[in-house]
């Protein structure tokens, strides 16, 4: 039997904190152990409460989420961190940086004005990610994808990399080790909103000897890209 997952909610918006806590309280596997309204409080409460998971807003007063994250990785290394980010170019850039600093995952803040839709979007993404981070038993997905289109006979040589939790940091470590003359095309699958994949590709391109770019529809595959 799984023990309850202890969660600390960090956001400067009282409305957002209440929204997140009310969503998480509906799941019997999750226990809200505390709330914080800025990075300074987050560091103090993380040391005191020792949560399993911390949901951390990026834009906050006194100490922003990125600065707080740097402290949390040193002072509360056993707590998993999920970043909350706005669906903007600035938010995407900050999120990719957070993932490179050691954040374990992220959830985009809903852009919809509908309260019900906001609740549904956060609930759909946040709860499974919290459970996955701590190894909580999740039900198997029963939905079967449509069959893939058959390829013409022949030899297709590519390197495929699929990543999930902790993906961006792992990708950077892998790509750093690959030579610039890598002999086959590389395909990376990472589930992210479009703005985030653009920022991720740009960051990986800076740290890799290979050319890394966001894929375009119909673009031919090239060796070493």
Predicted regions, residues:
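Strand-loop microenvironment adjacent to phosphate/nucleotide-handling motifs in alpha/beta enzyme folds
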Residues: 1-225
């Amino acid at each position: 039997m799984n023990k309850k997952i202890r969660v600390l909610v960090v956001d400067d918006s009282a409305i957002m904190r209440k929204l997140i806590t009310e969503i998480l309280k509906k799941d019997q596997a999750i226990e809200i152990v505390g709330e914080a309204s800025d990075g300074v409080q987050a560091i103090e409460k993380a040391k005191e409460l020792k949560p399993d998971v911390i949901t951390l807003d990026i834009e906050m007063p006194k100490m922003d989420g990125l600065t707080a994250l740097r402290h949390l990785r040193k002072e509360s290394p056993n707590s998993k961190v999920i970043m909350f980010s706005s669906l903007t170019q600035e938010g995407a850039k900050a999120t990719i940086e957070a993932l490179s600093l050691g954040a374990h995952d992220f959830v985009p803040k809903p852009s919809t004005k509908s309260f019900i839709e906001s609740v549904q979007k956060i609930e759909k993404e946040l709860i499974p990610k919290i459970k996955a981070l701590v190894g909580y038993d999740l039900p198997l997905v029963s939905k079967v994808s449509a069959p893939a289109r058959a390829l013409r006979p022949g030899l297709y040589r590519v390197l495929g990399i699929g990543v999930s939790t902790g993906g961006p940091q792992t990708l950077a470590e892998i790509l750093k080790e690959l030579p610039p003359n890598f002999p086959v095309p590389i395909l990376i699958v990472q589930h992210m909103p479009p703005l985030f994949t653009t920022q991720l590709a740009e960051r990986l391109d800076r740290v890799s000897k290979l050319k890394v770019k966001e894929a375009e529809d119909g673009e031919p595959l090239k060796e070493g890209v």
